[in-house]
């Protein structure tokens, strides 16, 4: 018995390789007697595909599984929508790194066939939600699977802010900003900023300062249930931006307050059977193999 009956397809736009893999995947799914629905934006690059179309939010409501063909950015974008319906997501890598999209396009029929036959592993990944308040009123909100980043925007200047964890004062800082990362995001921008790699099963949030004007500032790891609050200094000349996964952003003003916490909804991420997180790290990050290999 197949665990999935209705499959949604989302593809990376502007990538001929992704389109090629999408067409190949559609042909394969057509042999499996499954209902297939194509994301309406993806459908613009799949002329005459012959399948029903729907928005991403509707895909989450209608589908048992959504397959994303693209890079990690494509999956991050889909995750922020599909987490609302807890729809399982499976990634086929047609990007660069592919930390989250772990099926090779060369193995698409074999590996996806195994998943459709019920041979897969699933895990829950939490997201972060950021809110910006001005004079006590919410002026913006956004969420991210990888991270929430506070940065000065286009201006190359430092910003001043105060950091609080669960209402307790941590420090005041002048820096280029702060990366607040999930375990999923610990191998993304936070890694470039000198943050630790955090196993995705850990319920933890990492805070990584960006070029702090101090010799003693280091990344901090806190419980994922923590509430992170940032008070933007009123004397800042820059208008700090709050960026989620590098894809959505809210512009703040000096004096604003930002609150970041774990989002209630989680992403259900599907992997082929035998998925190994540390093997992924070795492959994607260029870690050394065992001696003699």
Swiss-Prot record:
GO terms for biological process: NAD metabolic process; NADP biosynthetic process. It is found in: Cytoplasm. One of its GO terms (molecular function) is ATP binding. Pfam families: NAD_kinase (PF01513), NAD_kinase_C (PF20143). One of its GO terms (cellular component) is cytoplasm. Its main location: cytoplasm. NAD(+) binds at residues 72-73, 146-147, 157, 174, 176, 187-192, 247. The active site is at residue 72. Keywords: ATP-binding, Cytoplasm, Kinase, NAD, NADP, Nucleotide-binding, Transferase. It is an enzyme of class 2 (transferase). Its cofactor is a divalent metal cation. It catalyses: NAD(+) + ATP = ADP + NADP(+) + H(+). Its EC number is 2.7.1.23. Belongs to the NAD kinase family. Involved in the regulation of the intracellular balance of NAD and NADP, and is a key enzyme in the biosynthesis of NADP. Catalyzes specifically the phosphorylation on 2'-hydroxyl of the adenosine moiety of NAD to yield NADP. NCBIfam families: PRK01231.1. This is NAD kinase. It comes from Chromohalobacter salexigens (strain ATCC BAA-138 / DSM 3043 / CIP 106854 / NCIMB 13768 / 1H11).
């Amino acid at each position: 018995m197949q665990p999935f009956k209705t499959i949604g397809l989302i593809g990376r736009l502007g990538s001929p390789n992704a389109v090629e893999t999408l067409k190949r995947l559609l042909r394969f799914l057509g042999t499996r007697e499954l209902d297939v629905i194509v994301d309406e934006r993806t459908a613009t690059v799949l002329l005459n595909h012959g399948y029903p179309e729907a928005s991403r939010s509707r895909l989450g409501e209608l589908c048992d599984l959504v397959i994303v063909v693209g890079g990690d950015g494509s999956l991050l974008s889909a995750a922020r929508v599909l987490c609302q319906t807890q729809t399982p997501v499976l990634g086929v890598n047609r990007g660069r790194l592919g930390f989250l999209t772990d099926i090779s396009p060369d193995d698409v029929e074999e590996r996806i066939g195994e998943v459709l036959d019920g041979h897969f592993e699933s895990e829950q990944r939490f997201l972060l939600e950021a809110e910006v308040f001005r004079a006590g009123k919410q002026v913006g909100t956004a969420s991210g699977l990888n991270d929430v980043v506070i940065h000065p925007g286009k201006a190359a200047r430092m910003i001043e802010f105060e950091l609080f964890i669960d209402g307790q004062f941590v420090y005041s800082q002048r820096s280029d900003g702060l990366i607040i990362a999930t375990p999923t995001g610990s191998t993304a921008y936070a890694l470039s900023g000198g943050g630790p790699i955090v196993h995705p099963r850990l319920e933890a949030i990492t805070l990584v300062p960006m070029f702090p004007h101090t010799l003693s500032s280091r990344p901090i790891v806190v419980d994922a249930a923590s509430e992170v609050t940032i008070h933007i200094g009123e004397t800042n000349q820059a208008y700090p931006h709050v960026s989620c996964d590098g894809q959505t952003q809210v512009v703040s003003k000096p004096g604003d307050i930002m609150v970041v916490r774990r989002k209630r909804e989680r992403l259900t991420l599907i992997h082929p059977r035998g998925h190994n997180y540390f093997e992924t790290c070795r492959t994607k990050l260029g870690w050394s193999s065992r001696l003699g290999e």
